[in-house]
Amino acid sequence: MEHWGEPIPGTGQSWRQPLSTSGRGWLGSAPWRWLGPTSWRWLGSAPWWWLGTATWWWRLGSRW
């Protein structure tokens, strides 16, 4: 996200023009605060959950 001040493609608006000040606070803090730790935690646990689910589905499918 290096082009923070550049216009959004297709519009004349800038990334720094949110709908409201509350929107700016939410857009400025929530995604990064949420995506940071949560995504790392999810990425750390998801592969094992995904492998377990895939294996379970494979076993279920192989029985039919």
From Swiss-Prot:
- Annotated keywords: Membrane, Mitochondrion, Mitochondrion outer membrane, Transmembrane, Transmembrane helix
Query: Membrane-spanning regions, if any?
Result: 40-58
Endpoints of the signal sequence? none
Q: Where in the cell is it found?
A: Mitochondrion outer membrane
> How would you describe this protein's topology in the membrane?
Single-pass membrane protein
Q: Does the keyword Electron transport apply?
A: no
From the UniProt entry, list the residue stretches annotated as the region Disordered: 1-22
Miscellaneous: This protein is produced by a bicistronic gene which also produces the major prion protein/PRNP from an overlapping reading frame. The alternative prion protein and PRNP (AC P23907) have no apparent direct functional relation since a mutation that removes the start codon of the AltPrP has no apparent effect on the biology of PRNP. In mouse and hamster, the alternative initiation AUG codon is absent and is replaced by a GUG codon.
Q: What protein name is recorded for this chain?
A: Alternative prion protein
